[in-house]
């Protein structure tokens, strides 16, 4: 993935959040597979961001400078054990993703849920050959709430089963300052402003938000 940045002694500490990966020696084939996966998913994410920009009647490259040459992106290989092992139905609590976009490849075991209204959850049923795509908080902020970050959670699978997924997260460079873009009047009228959550402050200076 992305190599560590070359930093001076007086560089802000948050810049050190982006560093080298630690690869398991027991799985030598993992590194080239994930590096290729990252490369392909980065291109998918950029294409989708540019499509969003056009749909918002912005220049196609409106978001390009925010992720730049050093986007903050990462991959998770996730296993959710069955409830008998965890003694809890919670796989991951309700949250929003912090970046621009996230892509989730699921196995056939359901468990991902999306909040469509306060306290109302629906299953994101796995579909073979597809990704679940979540809008993140940075897009919500950049569009003044016209695009809404997806509140989602994961419920642990039943006993004696497991759930596997691969998540890819595309974010901005750590030093990016995210503007609120000017939308055309017909879209701006529907922008509700970004949600305010005192437990999860949304800051325009990306580095200070980590």
State where each predicted segment sits:
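Peripheral, non-catalytic segments flanking oxidoreductase cores
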Residues: 1-210
